[in-house]
Amino acid sequence: FRGPGKYPHRTSGEQKRRNMLSGILLQPGAWFPAFGEVKDILISSCSFDQLDNPFLVTLNEGNRGERICLEHIRGTRLMKAAASVESWGDSSLKDVRLSDVSLSYVGNKDQEIVGRTPSKPLTDYRALPCWGLYLHNLDRVILRNVRLDCENGKVGPASCFDNVGSVEIYNVSF
């Protein structure tokens, strides 16, 4: 996935916006309730360059989820928002694994992200209280060979774990 887009967004009007928003956006029930399970998902071998956000996985009301794996993910020149895996529904997301993930951010000098209290995303990424990885309402997380870096200075923490049960960390750097 590479940004900016060759052609402008159809909905950008006079702005003729070409930025690429998110590489992966897995969000059942983003626009209206979509009840059911999200399980046994494998997202593998993806590369992202010059995107606003590499990936956002969000469960909403009426969704249950387990066994979500993102592996062999590379992101360069990422611009605006941390990667995130979140549950805002009735139950937490169980068994999330990030393995062999390397994300490099351009950097955000916006001091407003520090201490921000995130709310449920509507239909896309949004500003978060960290620049690299945000996890919310997850039961069990395994981070293996995860690297986060920021090219032009860091504002705020690299990662935020909000209401996360057990976390196993193996070879993680930022």
Residue ranges with predicted function:
Residues 1-174:
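Extracellular/periplasmic carbohydrate-active domains that bind, remodel
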